Amino acid sequence: MTAIDPHIMKQINCFIQTLAPLHPQAAYRIAVVEAYNTQKHVFKGMFLVQAPYYLVLSAKDHPFAAVNAGYVMEQLVLYLVSKGFATCYLGDAKSKPDLDQYQPMIVVAFGKAAATAVKKPASRKKLTELVNQPPVAQQNVRKIIEAARIAPSAFNLQPWRFMPQDGKIHIFMKKESLMQTKRMKELTLLDMGIAMCHMALAAEELWLDWRLSREDTSNEPIWKGCQYVATLYYEI
C-alpha cells in the first residue's frame, strides 16, 4: 500500500477544517488513521477492507449526531473522489471511543486507486418511488432530488423520501421494522445526512439560495410510514 505525499495529506487535513456541519451544535472530530505500513486490519467488524488510510468520525451524544456525521463525511468523501482517491464506507467497522465522550460514528477507507476503476451503475429506486406526488415538474427540484437519489446507503436501502412544495422540499426517512438494531438505525440516519449533502451541493451548483432546517414541531409535515427529518428551502 502506498503512502500519500505529505503535501497532499496537508491539503486533505486543511479541507477537513473547512467542512460545513448541518448541525453546528453537534460536536464531532475527524481523525486520519495511517495504515500503509501494516497488513493487519486496523478495525474490528464485518465487511472490512484493507486500505492505507482511514477516516474516523467521532461525535458527542446529540439528537442529530448521526445525520450530521453523514452530512459532513460525505463532503469529505466527494472531495477525495474528485482528487482521484478511492473511498469506501465501512458501516460495521468498530473503533475505540475517543477522548472527552466522543464516540466513533463512521469509518471511511481511502487511498490511491490501484487502477482506473470502472464502477457498475448502482441499483437505485426510480425517482417516482421517492416522492409523494410524482411526477416532479420543476426542473431544479428534480435535479436536487436526483442528486439525493444516487447517494450511497447502507445495504442500498435508500431510506430517503421527498415531498416537494413551493420553495421547499420536505425530507423524510422511511420507517423500518421495529426489530431494527440500534446501529442500523444510526446507519440509516447517517444515510439521510449523506443524501442531504448531495441535495445541498446540487442546490449550490444550480446557483440557488438555499438552507436546510427543520419545521417547528407543531408544523411538521406528515407522511404515513415515514419520519420527518428536515426541509430544504430554496429561492430561484
Report each predicted region and the residues it spans.
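Acidic, surface-exposed loops and disordered segments
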Residues: M1-I236
